[in-house]
Amino acid sequence: MLKGIAASAGVSVAKVYKLETPKVVIEKKAGVAQEEVKKFEDALEKTKKDIEGVKERAAKRLSDEELAVFDAHLMMAGDPELAGQIKAMIENDGVNAEYATEQVANQMVEMFESMDNDYFRERAADIKDVTFRLKCNLLGLTIPDLTSIAEDSIIVAHDLTPSDTAQLNEFVKGFATEIGGKTSHSAIMANSLEIPAVVGCPGVCDACKTGDTLALDALDGVVEINPDEETIAKYEAKAAAYLKEKEELKVLKNEKSVTTDGHEVELAGNIGGFKDVEGVLTNGGEGVGLFRTEFLYMDSDHFPTEDEQFEAYKQVLEGMQGKKVVVRTLDIGGDKHLSYYEFPQEMNPFLGYRAIRLCLKETDIFKTQLRALCRASVYGRLCIMFPMIATIKEFRDAKAIFEEVKAELIAEGVAVSDSIEVGMMVEIPAAAVLADQFAKYADFFSIGTNDLIQYSMAADRMSEHVSYLYQPYNPSVLRLVANTIKGAHEHGKWVGMCGAMAGEPHAVPILLGLGLDEFSMSATQILKARKVVKSLSYEEMQGLAQECLNKDTADEVLETVKTKLGE
């Protein structure tokens, strides 16, 4: 039995398909510069087409948010800096294209991996993925086609790239990898595809071969190779129980999210575009609590025009059939960059020029988005929120631009809804502390816990060295959440939460007790959260929440919740 990290829930038993990637051996050879440059350019063009092909196939199954990784790969393949350095080495050193590609790629990977910045460290993985495909094309090597798998299989690999994961078809019943974590691209995609996955499982590759039987328990993060009949029966029973629970949850699709003592909350979904709307509705979502509009920009090679954005927003609003849609205005910067916009070099871009800070400076970009949103507002129930608000002046300035745009459109004779709600993200501790003041001006709050926790604990959640400090259940974080809700309710304003915490089964009881009005999460989490809500007493959870606020540590909070739930 091998232990790993349960990254995408499920249990399955099937034959092993061991992913053997081509062994790339690069030799340094002298080459005729003109011929080698031509060979490189041809291979680069093929690489771009390969990535576009993978993205096109993946688009049938993945959301816009998950597809964004392929845009990053295409951006990398089209990066003139990368191509320029490789060509320069071919021409100046008289070496073959394969050797130049490997040398330049290694230098760039080493440089990015050494940077104290999440965005650039992630780019190192993109460079590896793209240049591996490029080197295979240069050498005439074939990358395994996972779409050709035609019998029930569990993939075992050192790692799965986004390109690999995007190719997984209905015959793939799960995968186990040596490395990776819950937030890796492959884990996120597996969740979206509802494929069981255990990652970070050292030794799994050496322990099995293609054709072995493998039991994959992605509920507890366990892998067993060639189990006996009794053990197989145990896992099959566990798989059946898990699937039965999923089926039972479906009956909750059209039910209200109401506690045992009659307190109702709203469970909504997070989306990256229109393609995600169906998932929210299928899973009984009562609205969209977060529409990440940055993917409209990241999927384009130019700033989307007003008309392009209008069509995208209209499509989502109509698709949600009158249910509330909360749109976050452009949240770019930090770890999200655009190929056609040059961001300033900053030591810490997560605390720098991003989101509303960029929009208040680049008002033309901001106004274009707001015009498109206002025009689309007549097609549904629209709420607009500004990200990364730190001061009341920022919110007032952003709201003033919205009012200006709205007035201009009305003067032009364009129909605009008179019931658009304008709110803000609470993801900076300063905003949470001053929530009662912000509530005088904002129509609603949406708490972005992913950033709020990072900024509160001064801990990069992607850094393995300090990830232990990323504590959603830390009493200090809970007090910021409580203060935000209290400040809003004092002024009759509602509060949502769109960070990962909103869908955590152990967090829901606390948040319910604190008075959170809207829980927005991945569509696949909605029904499970509804089951939790319907099993709880609001009055009892209020007592639990107060108890948790007075604990000393995150572990004590979690233990208190588990005890209350009888776990």
Predicted regions and their residues:
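Conserved alpha/beta-domain cores
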Residues: 246-567
